Amino acid sequence: MTSDIVVIGGGVAGVTAAQSLRSEGYDGRLVLIGKERELPYDRTALSKAVLAGDLADPPLLFPADWYDEWQIETVLDRTVLQVDVTRREVLLDGGPWLKVDRVLLATGASARVPSFSGSDLPGVATLRTADDVHRMRRDWEPGQRLVVVGGGLIGCEVATTARKLGLEVSILEASDELLQRVLGRRIGGWCRARLMELGISVVLNTGVAEFKGVDRITTVIGTDGRSFVADRAIVCVGAEPETAIAEQSGLACNRGILVNDSGGTAAEGVFAAGDVASWPLLTGGRRSLETYINSQREATAVASAMLGKAVHGPQLPLSWTEMAGHRIQMIGDIEGSGEYVMRGDPDDGPALLFRLSDGRVTAAVSVDAPRDFAMATRLVERGAQVGREVLGDTSMELRELNRAARERALIAE
């Protein structure tokens, strides 16, 4: 069995790459392999609409007949056991070997579960797949006491949804503020207040020492020694890139598969994108970004590179969430050195938080301000030089600041 290009991974990175390959004119054989039985679906709906019961299943990224129309072969509910990067072969569980010209590793990430005692007790959940959320919906009932371990994006989204379902919810967060890494302390604190208004208990500076129970979880023991009664618990403390295949194949990995800014690995013809890839950042350094939008952007860049086109696609973290009735968007790393500028007040309406580093706009977070966020995104991507007083002045349109920054950049060139 031969194949020109094999995409390993049925998430947004894999299917976006397949679509981009066809859009850019690739007409050879194209195989998409996914370990789940479902066609690629929107994982961002799992912690919100699907868990809430508003949707029975997560929306498919594309309908079944789309794959036929685009001549993309799907191999579902199968696991890739090995990739021979020298011979360019891919081994499926149960066989066969697939002979390939190029391969894309888009294997994603799995939920991180710290190795504390009791993490395997019934009633302790993680959320990464449709099967995970279906089990939670069957198992969770109004009035149950749920402990959410981790106050990041997924943890806070799950907590909000669980509260709507009538559960009594507590969040345990090991740091001194919710969402601090992705939203910054100011917006993180504002989100904490909104969650508490919903009746969610938030406990900061407290991680988990162990889960206790006999046939099912009954208690969560915090790192500060306190006990929290728990009928159910969910662990939301990040994800681990699925690098096993890459490591077995001899590819360099460090918290993700190391790739260049077009997604290429050290092995010719082997590429990686999405949550599994440690991608170069526009601001320097590298890491796995673990966002839907970045996965799409990486996959698009990789598709071009796989077809021999010159691509340079360093990334900026770019994501969004909906929480307690508010839409929050973010670009860049809001936590870091420099100074902060708040434009507006989220208590009174739309607002943006900017981080300036060496006088340049390096990150932004918006609350209920999608139009201004679009302008803020351009400022961050350009690394625009804007004074803090001007940036925080709501009487000045961000569009005008953008225009001025663009003109300065053209003059500098």
UniProtKB/Swiss-Prot annotation:
Induction comment: Transcription is up-regulated by aromatic compounds including biphenyl, ethylbenzene, benzene, toluene, xylene, cumene, cymene, and chlorinated benzenes. Is under the control of the BphST two-component regulatory system.
GO BP terms: catabolic process
Enzyme class: oxidoreductase
Keyword Metal-binding: no
GO molecular function term, any single one: oxidoreductase activity, acting on NAD(P)H
GO CC terms of this entry: cytoplasm
Annotated binding of NAD(+), by residue: 145-173
Transmembrane domains' residue ranges: none
Keyword set, alphabetical order: Aromatic hydrocarbons catabolism, Electron transport, FAD, Flavoprotein, NAD, Oxidoreductase, Plasmid, Transport
Disulfide linkage: none
Subunit structure: The multicomponent biphenyl dioxygenase system is composed of a ferredoxin reductase (BphA4), a ferredoxin (BphA3), and a terminal oxygenase (BphA1A2).
Role description: Ferredoxin reductase component of the biphenyl dioxygenase system that catalyzes the stereospecific dihydroxylation of the aromatic ring of biphenyl, yielding a dihydrodiol compound. Is likely involved in biphenyl degradation that allows growth of Rhodococcus sp. strain RHA1 on biphenyl as the sole source of carbon and energy. The dioxygenase system can also use naphtalene and 4-chlorobiphenyl (4-CB) as substrates, as well as some polychlorinated biphenyls (PCB) such as 2,2'-dichlorobiphenyl, 2,3-dichlorobiphenyl and 2,5,2'-trichlorobiphenyl.
Similarity annotation: Belongs to the bacterial ring-hydroxylating dioxygenase ferredoxin reductase family.
UniProt protein name: Biphenyl 2,3-dioxygenase, ferredoxin reductase component
Lineage: Bacteria, Bacillati, Actinomycetota, Actinomycetes, Mycobacteriales
